[in-house]
Amino acid sequence: MIIGLTGSIGMGKSTLARMARRLGVAVHDADATVHALLGRRGAAVAAVLAAFPGVGTLTEGIDRKALGARVFGRPPALARLEAILHPLVRRREAAFLRCCGLGRRKVVILDVPLLFETGGEHRCDRVMVVSAPAFLQSQRVLRRPGMTAALLADIRARQTPEVVKRLNAEAVVPTGLGPRPALRALRANLTMARSGVRRWRRGKRTYRPHA
């Protein structure tokens, strides 16, 4: 079973992915893949430099801050970047799934921040959304270096609304009460997935921002 793990910025998705790994689940991290693609001698570096000259070098990779300044708030530029990165991420993801299939893993997780925004839910048997109250989300995100309220507002505007994610997912894992309740919820969902139990609430899967 392929579980798509997603959640808006600051909801605790990365923490939940780490928990899943500790429980023995194979996790493909889309964000980490992007970092590798843009890093030193990364597979996307040449194409990104061709599209956005001056944001890095072929040997040292891409300066993510410089790249962000060129694309955030500029939909055509962001679309150009995504057209470079998304196919490469999909290839890495497909290779991961092939390896998991060879290893006969019953459950794997695709950790994808923009799962719904890119149509990634169609590649998953189930979708698990990580959620927390908006005030807690803001507290977490604004503690990050370089983050501002304006930047957070821009990120939120580009992400699928929280209520829509919850409605379109089969499982919602709350992180607002701390790690222990989140871990319990994760364990319960993984147990159902591994046993083939079909008690997961079917998500509506009606949101189509990518259509």
Curated annotation (Swiss-Prot):
Pathway membership: Cofactor biosynthesis; coenzyme A biosynthesis; CoA from (R)-pantothenate: step 5/5
Any single Pfam family the record assigns to this protein: CoaE
Binding-site residues, ATP: G10, M11, G12, K13, S14, T15
Gene Ontology BP annotations: coenzyme A biosynthetic process
Gene Ontology cellular component terms for the protein in this record: cytoplasm
Catalytic activity: 3'-dephospho-CoA + ATP = ADP + CoA + H(+)
InterPro entries: Depp_CoAkinase, P-loop_NTPase
EC number: 2.7.1.24
Signal peptide: none
Coiled-coil ranges per UniProt: none
Principal subcellular localization: cytoplasm
Compartments in which it is found: Cytoplasm
Gene3D superfamilies reported for this sequence: P-loop containing nucleotide triphosphate hydrolases
Domain DPCK: from-to ranges: 2-204
One example GO MF annotation: dephospho-CoA kinase activity
Keyword tags: ATP-binding, Coenzyme A biosynthesis, Cytoplasm, Kinase, Nucleotide-binding, Transferase
Cited PANTHER family: BIFUNCTIONAL COENZYME A SYNTHASE-RELATED, DEPHOSPHO-COA KINASE-RELATED
Purpose: Catalyzes the phosphorylation of the 3'-hydroxyl group of dephosphocoenzyme A to form coenzyme A.
Protein family according to the UniProt entry: Belongs to the CoaE family.
NCBIfam families assigned: dephospho-CoA kinase (TIGR00152)
HAMAP family recorded: Dephospho_CoA_kinase
Descriptive protein name: Dephospho-CoA kinase
Source organism (scientific name): Rhodospirillum rubrum (strain ATCC 11170 / ATH 1.1.1 / DSM 467 / LMG 4362 / NCIMB 8255 / S1)
